């Protein structure tokens, strides 16, 4: 049972597919966060290692993790945000995939492995904090919005240090800081390759950009994409934004399958990726039983919406003798 503290509530993302703990008194995730997560997720594979810097309550990582099986490390300075992030991760049963660290992003290289991440995602403080500048009296909100604990160059330097060669950084920021992002990127071996602007309404100046940069990438070939409109004339979200906010999670399919081995025996198994599993069996990496009985042929399969049922069918098939298996397969119209 996840406990909520005073002023906390549970909000939803992706319709009602994800839950997240927020506090009406502190900084909540915004559309900026979801736009960043939506763009970055396209670069993330199931085996990717991803780090989110300035992660807040882990909204971006939760969103991205819903679309793949990658592992995420989140770094957030503020204790109250870390608490909400960790409980939100638990609320969505993602403890084995998202790890939340409390610390200053400047120090991330001391507790995260350098040169090891495929993707860095960051929604940094947007505004500088010159002497005498009036800040939000709420310290938590001031830190989230202004460069009080870390500045833009430091964030880019840390991002570059964590990325593998050719790894990608995705950053959401204000257009007026774009020149600095490009400059600091070159300085720290991060070549900006794509800039995606967003406008509140067509005809207005951009008020947000998402930048994609590549570590040790070539300095030429920057693509400035057509601006995406956020709001219709009546103030409602455009179809492009609705797609991001209400995107449906991919439905994972689960299979019970039967292989015919080279010695004429049968092997029953479970998978959620038929092609990859068959390739594994025929390369000798699928199972101890099939390793010495290659090549194998998939002769029967059943599809299920849940993993448990498919694995029960695997167990059921394996615990019958040869005669029963032959009879079962013949009844299903399988010729062998």
PLM-predicted stretches and their roles:
Residues 2-44:
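Class I SAM-dependent transferase core
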Residues 17-18, 134-143, 291-296:
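Short glycine/proline- and charge-enriched loop/turn segments
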Residues 22, 102-103, 173, 196:
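Short loop/edge segments at beta-strand edges and connector loops
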Residues 40-122, 128-133:
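Conserved SAM/SAH cofactor-binding pocket of Class I
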Residues 124-154:
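Mobile active-site "lid"/loop adjacent to the S-adenosyl-L-methionine
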Residues 148-206, 210:
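Conserved Class I SAM-dependent methyltransferase catalytic core
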Residues 205-251:
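SAM/dcSAM-binding transferase cores
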Residues 250-287, 291-323, 332-336:
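GIY-YIG nuclease catalytic motif and its immediate N-terminal context
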């Amino acid at each position: 049972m996840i406990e909520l503290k005073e002023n906390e509530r549970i909000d939803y993302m992706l319709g009602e597919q994800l839950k997240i703990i927020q506090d009406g008194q502190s900084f909540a995730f915004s559309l900026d966060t979801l736009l960043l997560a939506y763009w970055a997720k396209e670069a993330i594979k199931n085996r990717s290692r991803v780090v989110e810097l300035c992660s807040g309550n882990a909204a971006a990582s939760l969103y991205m993790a819903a679309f793949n099986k990658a592992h995420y490390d989140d770094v957030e300075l503020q204790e109250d945000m870390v608490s909400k992030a960790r409980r939100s991760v638990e609320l969505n049963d993602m403890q084995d995939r998202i790890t939340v660290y409390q610390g200053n992003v400047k120090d991330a290289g001391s507790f995260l492995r350098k040169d090891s991440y495929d993707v860095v995602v960051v929604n940094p403080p947007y505004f500088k904090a010159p002497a005498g500048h009036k800040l939000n009296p709420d310290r938590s909100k001031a830190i989230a919005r202004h460069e009080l604990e870390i500045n833009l160059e430091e964030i880019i330097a840390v991002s570059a240090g964590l990325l593998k060669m050719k790894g990608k950084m995705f950053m959401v920021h204000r257009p007026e800081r774009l020149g600095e992002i490009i400059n600091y990127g070159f300085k720290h071996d991060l070549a900006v390759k794509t800039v995606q602007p967003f406008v509140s309404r067509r005809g207005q100046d951009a008020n947000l950009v998402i930048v994609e940069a590549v570590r040790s990438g070539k300095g030429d070939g920057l693509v400035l994409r057509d601006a995406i409109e956020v709001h219709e004339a009546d103030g409602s979200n455009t179809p492009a934004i609705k797609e991001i906010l209400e995107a449906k999670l991919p439905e994972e399919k689960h299979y019970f399958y039967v292989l015919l081995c080279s010695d004429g025996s049968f092997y029953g198994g479970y998978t959620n990726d038929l092609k990859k599993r068959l390739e594994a069996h025929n390369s000798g990496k699928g199972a101890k039983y099939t390793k010495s009985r290659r090549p194998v042929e998939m002769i029967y399969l059943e599809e299920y919406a849940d993993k448990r049922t498919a694995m029960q069918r695997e167990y059921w098939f394996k615990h019958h003798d040869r005669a029963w298996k032959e009879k079962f397969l013949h009844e299903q119209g399988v010729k062998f």
